[in-house]
């Protein structure tokens, strides 16, 4: 696996790996601290016939002033070893000064999708996400980009960006991978202390309960309220638990074919996200 840290080397590596554009290239964007969920995206891209590139960049513009940018786990040597083992051909590790050089003045804002749910709790978060993803897509120029289902709102924001800006890239979503107890895999799970780690699977359990209640015909408002209450009783501070349209993220009063439950809640200082299709 090639590891590149500047744009000229990236362009040269891309040209060589794709045989001048004759082979299809996939990008798996990450912030490092890789887990099996990330690696499953690499393997899925390979199985689809792509040469695979992965980026490792902890993007400062998607963190709020009181969030965990400085303590976000960083171990690029470990991450690169895992990527190579999974069959990744190219690792792109840019510096902040490469992604945001002096004079950088452009950002990408997605109206509507960026200001609800996670965007309401973390103002400006999706501006940072959308901007860095557009930069990465412009640098790597992949035919496809792979993202995880767990960050469902992020996927919809990126799909909207790609459609609105006519970006020639296919957005592919890989399923959420879970620990044996149901907790969605996440780089931030390592922040959980033993007591909170034991409580953490409740988030997915509650989503499944709410889904079952909705399928049994319970009114959405009652099912969601019961879910929020169960999380609070289990030690979570709930940011949101909502039933939404999977594409528009508009709130729903009853499930339909495109319905999805999205949740974010905190245990101690750790925020956990999860989602299930209804």
Curated annotation (Swiss-Prot):
Domain of life: Bacteria
Positions of (R)-pantoate binding: 62, 154
GO molecular function: ATP binding; pantoate-beta-alanine ligase activity
Binding of ATP, residues: 31-38, 148-151, 177, 185-188
Catalytic activity from the UniProt record: (R)-pantoate + beta-alanine + ATP = (R)-pantothenate + AMP + diphosphate + H(+)
GO biological process: pantothenate biosynthetic process
Pathway assignment: Cofactor biosynthesis; (R)-pantothenate biosynthesis; (R)-pantothenate from (R)-pantoate and beta-alanine: step 1/1
InterPro entries, alphabetized: Pantoate_ligase (IPR003721), Pantoate_ligase_C (IPR042176), Rossmann-like_a/b/a_fold (IPR014729)
Pfam families attached to this UniProt entry: Pantoate_ligase (PF02569)
Enzyme nomenclature, EC number: 6.3.2.1
Residue positions of the active site: 38
UniProtKB keywords: ATP-binding, Cytoplasm, Ligase, Nucleotide-binding, Pantothenate biosynthesis
Binding, beta-alanine: 62
Task of the protein: Catalyzes the condensation of pantoate with beta-alanine in an ATP-dependent reaction via a pantoyl-adenylate intermediate.
NCBIfam families tied to this protein: panC
Miscellaneous comment text of the record: The reaction proceeds by a bi uni uni bi ping pong mechanism.
PANTHER family given in the database record: CYTIDYLATE KINASE/PANTOATE-BETA-ALANINE LIGASE, PANTOATE--BETA-ALANINE LIGASE
Self-association and partners: Homodimer.
Protein name, per record: Pantothenate synthetase
Protein source organism: Acidiphilium cryptum (strain JF-5)
Gene name of the record: panC
């Amino acid at each position: 696996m090639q590891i590149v840290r500047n744009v000229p080397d990236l362009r040269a590596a891309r040209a060589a790996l794709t045989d001048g554009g004759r082979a299809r290239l996939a990008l798996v964007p990450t912030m490092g601290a890789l887990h099996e969920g990330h690696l499953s995206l690499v393997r899925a891209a390979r199985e689809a016939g792509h040469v695979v590139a992965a980026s490792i960049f902890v993007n400062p513009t998607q963190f709020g002033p009181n969030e965990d940018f400085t303590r976000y786990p960083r171990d690029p040597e470990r991450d690169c070893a895992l990527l190579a083992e999974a069959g990744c051909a190219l690792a792109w590790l840019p510096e902040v000064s490469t992604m945001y050089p002096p004079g950088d003045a452009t950002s990408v804002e997605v109206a509507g999708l960026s200001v609800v749910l996670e965007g309401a709790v973390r103002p400006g978060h999706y501006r940072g996400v959308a901007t860095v993803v557009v930069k990465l897509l412009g640098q790597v120029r992949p035919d496809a980009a792979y993202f995880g289902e767990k960050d469902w709102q992020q996927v919809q924001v990126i799909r909207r960006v790609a459609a609105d800006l006519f970006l020639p890239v296919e957005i592919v979503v890989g399923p959420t991978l879970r620990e044996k107890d149901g907790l969605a895999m996440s780089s931030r799970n390592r922040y959980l202390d033993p007591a909170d780690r034991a409580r953490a699977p409740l988030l997915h359990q509650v989503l499944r309960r709410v889904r079952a209640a909705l399928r049994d015909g319970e009114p959405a408002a009652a099912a969601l309220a019961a879910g929020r209450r169960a999380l609070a009783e289990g030690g979570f501070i709930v940011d949101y638990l909502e039933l939404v349209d999977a594409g528009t993220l508009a709130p729903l009063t009853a499930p339909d074919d495109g319905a999805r439950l999205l949740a974010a809640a905190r245990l101690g200082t750790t925020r956990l996200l999860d989602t299930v299709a209804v």
